[in-house]
Design a protein with these regions (language model features):
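Bacterial N-terminal signal peptides that target proteins for export
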Residues: 2-13
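Extracytosolic ligand-binding ectodomains
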Residues: 2, 27-426
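Hydrophobic helical h-region of N-terminal Sec-dependent signal peptides
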Residues: 14-19
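C-terminal motif of bacterial Sec signal peptides marking the signal peptidase cleavage site
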Residues: 21-25
Length: 426
């Protein structure tokens, strides 16, 4: 397998740091290598004989900025490390940055700009499934390649997307299995009103019913909704044993703070969340979220040598108060996996890179553990970790799968999912 050692790269990067700082346009900061939030490209972003240009496409403004900034920062960290270690195929990476502004239509427009006008070699971007689905036809029409870093609802596969976050069998399904094994039977489903939560809840409903459980309520909130009083009243009336939370962005802040105002804690209404990571805990407050559960593949507390190096590098670059998270780590992995695929291909050409990926041997010794791109569906083999939020603001693993889990985005290996006939929501 083609593997990259994070410890070796970190050591080499440290020894070359002074050299790297002298290189023009190496992608070391947003101001000198990418673009400003309004999309104005700096001079250093121009491609040349010694550089290769990539795109970063995330929400720097709007309701999703709370989550996507950390993902963008992790990508920049990976770019800086790779540049300090010699670059990719002898070229330094420069990045062009665009703001999706938490609007799917804006993501589509900015994706086309990166591909058609900026002529980037690849794009790292998106968070919500709505933004991913908005850009998917753009990448397919231009035969460009998107690296998508966030867990999602599955039911999708594209030759022009590499999915470095979890498929549903690597986050949602094992989390529900964990709760069922713990004796939870009455589930309340709460989500933002878009593709991921609605499809995720179709999956969860089928799984819970097949196991003899009950969904006692299902509610959705607009992405910019701030008043959760009516939804909280419905939760009180339903009296669930567990809330399954697929809210995204600032909705999580409003919901949990309003629950806290009613003195509801994890003791009264325990919650399993699929889009709350360390960054959101820092924003909402550990005093509010302690005791609640989450399901991911990585936490800042994950005990691997590669993660220790990653956390130290992230905090050194962005500040000791900053925290890492699963989506940030998956975004960081994506840059290294792209590097490995280009080096196997011997080219930045999209078709050559896709051909290299199809061999199923592109791996990275990531902070979460070794991840490998499945050559057929372009999702990653990943470990699964259930975590609990503690009062120090960190998330600690309470369960993990004994081995990494192969991706099954369409849940074809689960009889209850096949029988339910779950279909993607467009």
């Amino acid at each position: 397998m083609k593997k990259v050692s994070l410890r070796k790269i970190a050591a080499l990067a440290a020894s070359m740091a002074m050299f790297a700082m002298t290189l023009a346009g190496c992608g070391s900061t947003a101001s000198d290598s990418g673009t400003s939030a309004d999309g104005t490209t700096s001079a250093a972003a121009a491609s040349g004989d010694d550089t290769v240009k990539v795109g970063l496409l995330h929400s720097l403004t709007g309701s999703m900025a709370i989550s996507e900034k950390a993902v963008r920062d992790a990508e920049v960290l990976a770019i800086d490390e790779i540049n300090a270690a010699g670059g990719v195929l002898g070229k330094q990476i420069v990045y062009v940055e665009e703001d999706g502004a938490s609007e799917p239509s804006t993501f589509a427009t900015k994706a086309e700009k990166l591909i058609d006008s900026e002529k980037v070699a690849t794009v790292f971007g998106c968070w919500t499934s709505s933004s991913r689905k908005a850009v998917k036809p753009v990448f397919e029409d231009y035969n460009a390649l998107l690296w998508y870093p966030v867990q999602y609802e599955g039911m999708e596969q594209s030759p022009n997307i590499v999915y470095t976050g979890a498929a549903p069998n690597q986050q949602i399904v094992p989390a529900i299995e964990y709760l069922l094994d713990k004796g939870y039977k009455k589930f309340f489903l709460l989500g933002s009103d878009y593709v991921f939560p609605r499809t995720a809840n179709m999956i969860i409903t089928a799984q819970v019913k097949a196991a003899g459980g009950e969904v006692v309520g299902e509610e959705y909130a607009d992405m910019d909704q701030t008043d959760f009083a009516a939804i909280i009243s419905k939760i009180e009336a339903a009296q669930p044993e567990i809330i399954i939370n697929t809210l995204n962005g600032t909705g999580n802040v409003s919901f949990f703070k309003q629950m806290a105002e009613k003195n509801y804690t994890s003791a009264e209404y325990p919650t399993m969340s699929f889009s709350i990571a360390e960054e959101e805990v820092a924003t909402i407050g550990a005093d509010i979220l302690k005791g609640h559960m989450v399901s991911w593949n990585y936490y800042e507390t994950t005990d691997t040598p590669e993660n220790k190096a990653f956390v130290e590098a992230y905090k050194a670059k962005f500040g000791e108060s900053r925290v890492t998270s699963d989506p940030a780590e998956a975004a960081y992995d994506a840059v290294y996996l792209w590097k490995a695929a280009c080096e196997k291909a011997g080219s930045f050409d999209v078709d050559a890179v896709k051909e290299a990926i199809s061999g199923g041997d592109i791996s990275f010794n990531a902070p979460e553990g070794t991840v490998t791109i499945n050559g057929t569906n372009q999702h990653l083999t990943k470990p699964v970790r259930i975590g609990e939020i503690r009062d120090d603001g960190l998330i600690y693993e309470v369960y993990s799968t004994p081995t990494a889990v192969d991706p099954d985005p369409y849940l074809t290996t689960y009889d209850w999912a096949v029988e339910a006939g779950i279909q993607p929501i467009e």
